[in-house]
Regions:
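Sec-dependent N-terminal signal peptides
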Residues: 4-14
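Glycine/tyrosine- and acidic-biased, solvent-exposed loop/turn segments at the edges of beta-strands
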Residues: 16-216
Length: 216
């Protein structure tokens, strides 16, 4: 009896924490199959004892009782297609939110660590594309300009202990400083702008003191 009450409490707790965000495993609960009933043949998913590629929604569970959701999504003709999510902590927290088109990741991709967003960007036919952003402690840690799954350039951010941005440095795909680097005083005032090209200092563009008075 005690175990039943604990399980009931946990299920209610999970529902309250996830439902506001409409997690797929909650929306799909009554209209999906357990992915344990799917098998793969030549790269396509089939339900056991069937000959047609599976189309429909699925939920994968960590446990044999179907209590802790691990992932949820849908297949179309045996390939992942549509919204897709992975979970941590028995479904309490998001791990990945993405989407697929004909078996390839396509659309917005978000990745989480212990429920906190750590990376987001866009996928196009299975390849990263456009601007990607990384986060740490809720602040932007880096950005990347990506084309056809390859990094063209990236920017690193550093911060003072008070949360104010300290530096913003731009790098090329060889990890060399390239472009305009910015530094800031602890009060948020711009300290300097410096131009680099392929790792070589080109010029000091601007420099300011703590109060915003130009020094060059």
């Amino acid at each position: 009896m005690k175990k039943l009450l604990i399980n009931t409490f946990l299920f209610s707790f999970l529902s309250l924490n996830i439902e506001a965000n409409e997690a797929l495993f909650i929306k799909y609960a009554d209209k999906s199959i357990n992915s344990s009933s799917l098998v793969e043949r030549q790269g396509l998913k089939y339900q056991v004892n069937t000959n047609s590629p599976f189309s429909g929604r699925f939920i994968t569970y960590e446990d044999e009782f179907g209590f802790c959701a691990k992932e949820a999504g849908s297949y179309r003709r045996g390939l992942l297609h549509g919204p897709y999510e992975e979970y941590a902590g028995c479904g309490i927290l998001y791990s990945i939110k993405s989407s697929y088109k004909n078996g390839l990741e396509h659309g917005t991709y978000s990745e989480f660590d212990e429920g906190f967003l750590i990376m987001e960007g866009n996928m196009f036919n299975g390849m990263a594309e456009g601007e990607w952003v990384g986060y740490e402690y809720g602040r932007i840690s880096w950005t990347e300009d990506v084309k056809n799954d390859e990094t063209i350039s990236f920017t690193n951010y550093s911060y003072y202990d008070n949360g104010q941005i300290s530096t913003k440095d731009v790098y090329n795909n060889n990890e060399e400083l390239h472009g305009i680097s910015e530094a800031y005083h602890q009060n948020g005032q711009l300290k300097s702008k410096t131009e680099y090209q392929n790792g070589t200092l080109v010029r000091l563009i601007e420099e300011y003191d703590f109060n915003g008075n130009r020094l060059n």
